[in-house]
């Protein structure tokens, strides 16, 4: 296999100027968001010196993401996705500006900071599903997986760069400048999407409110491939997410050095960036379901071995492998969702994917913490990895369509429930 086919597929950057602008804006906004997150955590801790309040930062972001996300997808399936994204992006930028104002003023109650974060997350719950339809609408079917891989590697690179850069800016100038840079990043994201054409949903708009949410649930229940993709992701995150266990495992087995802990956290990201950079052969393979199952199984197996090893270097290698496997699975899952979902439902299903992608890891860290509290960090890691492996095997065995070769954009036969969910309401 040639090197050019192994490295990340950059055809979307050559063939689609609109995608190039979008990727530039998205990369900038992800960088700004990670810088702002460092500032938020530091500011809340500096104001309260309480782990309860710093924990509330995650709640202020996660709760609106779940609640508003249920209906944000329906909104994206009723109107022009470009306009919805632009309005929501302006809202996020305004929230970042208000965070900067409160940081410069000082002496603002911590509840105000959390409230601004919650509103910011509400806008993100709307912009995410709207942006989720851009790639399949802008790129040919055979380039969708490559476009998603480019999105993934840009996000992971900013995940590595953003916290470090945010810490430097925070130390030099304070939290207010971090928030201002975050607001600027949303201006760049606005620029990236401003030149897009109108992107209304194909066919009739979705039903409003709870009816639209129920349509999405009927689609997920009826489409075995998309349902299997989301269940596989939940198996990998809810059952085996290791991040919350790293401090305990580091203390139990590797001496408790903060440098080792930092390397553990970085190793997963390094694996993810490496997998994205070498994703060309994967995105061209045409079997995203099989790749996703293998990636999720490798993730679980690597975490089992990490829980059993006593060598920090072997542990780092296994975490790099786990990060690479997870990224491969995420790219493949997104490819399945983007290419197998009717456009009329894509906003709502993307919202479900967003909730799964963000809620699953939080639940997984909670599961790991509870099991470790009853037993040990090693037991929590090994049991989680084994349960992930068993769950992935079950999903793969019960959903043979996931293992089949399928050309991008060619859906499997759907059930009557699926067709009903995608059909417009005429009542």
Regions found by a protein language model. Name each.
Residues 1-427:
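Alpha-helical transmembrane-bundle signature of multi-pass membrane transport and export proteins
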């Amino acid at each position: 296999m040639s090197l050019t086919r192994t490295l990340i597929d950059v055809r979307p950057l050559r063939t689609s100027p609109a995608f190039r602008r979008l990727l530039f804006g998205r990369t900038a906004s992800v960088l700004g968001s990670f810088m702002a997150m460092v500032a938020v955590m530091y500011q809340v801790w500096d104001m309260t010196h309480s782990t309860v309040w710093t924990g509330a930062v995650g709640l202020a972001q996660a709760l609106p993401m779940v609640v508003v996300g249920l209906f944000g997808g329906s909104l994206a399936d009723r109107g022009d996705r470009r306009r919805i994204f632009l309005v929501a992006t302006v809202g996020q930028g305004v929230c970042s500006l208000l965070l900067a104002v409160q940081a410069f003023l000082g002496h603002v109650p911590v509840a105000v900071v959390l409230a601004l974060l919650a509103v910011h997350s509400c806008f993100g719950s709307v912009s995410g599903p709207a942006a989720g339809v851009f790639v399949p609408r802008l790129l040919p079917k055979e380039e969708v997986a490559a476009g998603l891989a480019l999105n993934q590697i840009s996000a992971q690179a900013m995940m590595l760069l953003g916290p470090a850069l945010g810490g430097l800016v925070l130390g030099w100038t304070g939290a207010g400048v971090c928030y201002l840079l975050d607001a600027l990043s949303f201006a760049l994201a606005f620029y990236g999407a401003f030149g897009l054409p109108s992107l209304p949903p194909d066919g009739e708009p979705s039903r409003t409110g709870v009816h639209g949410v129920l349509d999405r649930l009927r689609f997920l229940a009826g489409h075995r491939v998309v349902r299997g993709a989301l269940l596989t992701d939940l198996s990998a995150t809810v059952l085996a997410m290791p991040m919350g266990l790293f401090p305990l495992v580091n203390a139990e087995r590797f001496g408790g050095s903060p440098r080792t802990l930092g390397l553990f956290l970085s190793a997963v990201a390094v694996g993810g960036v490496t997998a994205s950079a070498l994703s060309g052969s994967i995105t061209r393979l045409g079997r995203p379901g099989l790749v996703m199952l293998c990636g999720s199984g490798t993730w679980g197996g690597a975490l089992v071995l990490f829980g059993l090893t006593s060598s920090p270097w072997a542990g780092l290698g296994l975490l790099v492998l786990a990060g690479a496997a997870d990224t491969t699975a995420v790219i493949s899952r997104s490819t399945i969702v983007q290419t197998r979902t009717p456009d009329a439902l894509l906003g709502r299903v993307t919202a479900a994917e967003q909730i799964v992608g963000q809620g699953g890891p939080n639940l997984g860290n909670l599961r790991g913490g509870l099991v470790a509290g009853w037993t040990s960090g090693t037991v929590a890691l090994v049991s989680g990895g084994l349960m992930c492996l068993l769950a992935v095997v079950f999903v793969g065995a019960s959903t043979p369509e996931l293992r089949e070769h399928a050309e991008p954009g060619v859906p499997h036969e759907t059930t009557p429930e699926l067709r009903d969910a995608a059909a417009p309401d005429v009542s």
